[in-house]
Amino acid sequence: MTGQVRVAVIGASGRMGRALLEACDNHDGIVLGAAIERAGSTLVGVDAGEMAGIGHLGLALVDNLDAVADKFDVLIDFTSPEGTLANLEWCARQGKAIVIGTTGFNHAQKEQVVAFAEETPVVMAPNMSVGVNLMWKLLELAAKVMGDYTDIEIIEGHHRHKKDAPSGTALKMGEVIAQALGRDLEKVAVYGREGITGERDRETIGFATIRAGDLVGEHTAMFADIGERLEITHKASSRMTFANGAMRAAKWLAEQKPGLYDMQQVLGLN
């Protein structure tokens, strides 16, 4: 595809949606083609830029994809698992690419994403920050060097409104570490501890979750030995880091064939 990539943002009035609208406005090679809200929203008809606090864009919010089907090439979706699957099905029918930043999918829902990706290009990533994706590469190296003789813990914190726990990013951290060590995360993950738990099993990977205030996103992996520990941490101070990553993914995805891709591929880290 040549020229600008036309992007649609769904869930435009949410915290992430507003950041995505701002990122669209700031990125060369990206043009905002549509901004979509839930059906019946009182914001329908309002200028998307004025709603997001970035100035008049001359683009009114709508409440269904069919109304703007000819206005965009790539849909960006950070909504909910159920909503995202419905939007993905629509994109597959229409031949539209989709960038998915939604988290909280169960196993069956992930299988549906895989199936739809046979029909249309999909980037799906629990975190689109460049720093987080680099962190996953560092975790793979740390696990290979230290994982067999250290206790591994993952601690994550987000704002009080986040609905799923642990975060998709934390789970991906666990998957990267477990895969590097030849372990099955479903068998070795320990989610929180309470009461008399007994001595720690060296094979386990622990998860701890914080939900407080307006934390944007903080993730730490700890490799703890007797006498020393290594901590690898990423802290996001603004949702714009995720929104900017989504713009990068959208531009890359517009050139791809149908298939399921991740941010490692977008960034050339594979």
From Swiss-Prot:
InterPro entries given in the database record: DapB_C (IPR022663), DapB_N (IPR000846), DapB_N_CS (IPR022664), DHDPR_bac (IPR023940), NAD(P)-bd_dom_sf (IPR036291)
EC number: 1.17.1.8
Alphabetically ordered keywords of this record: Amino-acid biosynthesis, Cytoplasm, Diaminopimelate biosynthesis, Lysine biosynthesis, NAD, NADP, Oxidoreductase
Binding sites annotated in the UniProt record for NAD(+): G11, A12, S13, G14, R15, M16, E37, G101, T102, T103, A125, P126, N127, M128
CDD domains assigned: DHDPR_N
Catalytic activity as recorded in UniProt: (S)-2,3,4,5-tetrahydrodipicolinate + NAD(+) + H2O = (2S,4S)-4-hydroxy-2,3,4,5-tetrahydrodipicolinate + NADH + H(+); (S)-2,3,4,5-tetrahydrodipicolinate + NADP(+) + H2O = (2S,4S)-4-hydroxy-2,3,4,5-tetrahydrodipicolinate + NADPH + H(+)
Pathway stated in the Swiss-Prot or TrEMBL entry: Amino-acid biosynthesis; L-lysine biosynthesis via DAP pathway; (S)-tetrahydrodipicolinate from L-aspartate: step 4/4
Enzyme class: oxidoreductase
Gene3D superfamilies on file: Dihydrodipicolinate Reductase, domain 2, NAD(P)-binding Rossmann-like Domain
List of catalytic residues: H158 (proton donor/acceptor), K162 (proton donor)
Biological processes annotated in GO: diaminopimelate biosynthetic process; lysine biosynthetic process via diaminopimelate
Sites where the protein binds (S)-2,3,4,5-tetrahydrodipicolinate: H159, G168, T169
Subcellular location: Cytoplasm
Positions that bind NADP(+): R38
Gene Ontology molecular-function annotations: 4-hydroxy-tetrahydrodipicolinate reductase; NAD binding; NADP binding; oxidoreductase activity, acting on CH or CH2 groups, NAD or NADP as acceptor
A GO-annotated cellular component: cytosol
Function: Catalyzes the conversion of 4-hydroxy-tetrahydrodipicolinate (HTPA) to tetrahydrodipicolinate.
Family to which the UniProt record says this protein belongs: Belongs to the DapB family.
NCBIfam families, alphabetized: dapB
Protein name as annotated: 4-hydroxy-tetrahydrodipicolinate reductase
The organism of origin for this protein: Shewanella amazonensis (strain ATCC BAA-1098 / SB2B)
